[in-house]
């Protein structure tokens, strides 16, 4: 409803798919994603995309749940053996891959963390790398931005990263990433990172920064519903 009131044409709903949510990583706990097919495709005049923000969990760029075996449905019936990640991704239009817990990357080389992001981008459902500027994991910006460009995928410039009380250092990092996206021709998204309804569609901080660096409008996937959907279908089919 908030998206409709703010004149949005398209809303991507990407709740966290992460070990942060539950102590037990079962299909029952992540049933919300399994039921995405029951969500409407339009609500109050706003078209809806179904997705998730999925955690990268190791230096190989694996996504959370890739190694968690699922052999039953949410009702307990036996199903074809698969993984939790496969079950969650099945009905997602796209995924944002991001890092939250990062102890596993503590002593990693720049080459390793860079390859981690490149590997994550190669997942068939991953469209966007999320909040790179505040992940706390150093990497080769040019290499990752170039890989995203070559795959037709996106780098997120995250509103919440620029709206924090400690945002000054993060803003420098995010600005640098955005500038390299502009210079290398890589598409960006600018997610509101809304964890509450009143922040849906909020992107003032990102918008101001992009204006300041004269970011090319044609590289902003969120400039229109048609632009985002076109980029999604070009990248993921």
Where are these regions (language model features)?
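Catalytic domains of carbohydrate-active enzymes, especially glycoside hydrolases
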Residues: 1-14
């Amino acid at each position: 409803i908030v998206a409709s009131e703010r004149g949005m044409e398209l809303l991507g709903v990407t709740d966290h798919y992460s070990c942060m949510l539950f102590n037990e990583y079962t299909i029952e706990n992540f049933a919300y994603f399994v039921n995405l097919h029951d969500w409407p495709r339009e609500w109050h005049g706003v078209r809806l995309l179904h997705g998730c923000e999925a955690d990268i969990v190791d230096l190989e760029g694996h996504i959370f749940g890739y190694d968690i075996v699922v052999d039953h449905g949410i009702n307990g019936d036996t199903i074809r053996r698969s993984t939790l990640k496969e079950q969650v991704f099945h009905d997602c239009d796209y995924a944002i891959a991001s890092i939250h817990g990062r102890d596993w990357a503590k002593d990693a080389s720049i080459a390793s963390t860079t390859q981690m992001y490149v590997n994550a981008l190669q997942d068939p459902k991953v469209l966007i790398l999320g909040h790179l500027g505040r992940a706390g994991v150093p990497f080769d910006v040019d290499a990752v931005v170039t890989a995203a460009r070559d795959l037709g995928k996106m780098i997120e410039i995250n509103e919440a990263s620029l709206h924090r009380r400690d945002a000054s250092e993060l803003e420098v990092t995010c600005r640098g990433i955005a500038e390299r996206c502009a210079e290398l021709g890589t598409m960006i998204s600018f997610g509101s990172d809304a964890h509450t309804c009143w922040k849906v569609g909020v992107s003032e901080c990102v918008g101001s920064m992009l204006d300041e660096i004269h970011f090319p409008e044609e590289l902003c996937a969120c400039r229109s519903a048609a632009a985002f959907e076109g980029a999604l279908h070009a990248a993921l089919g």
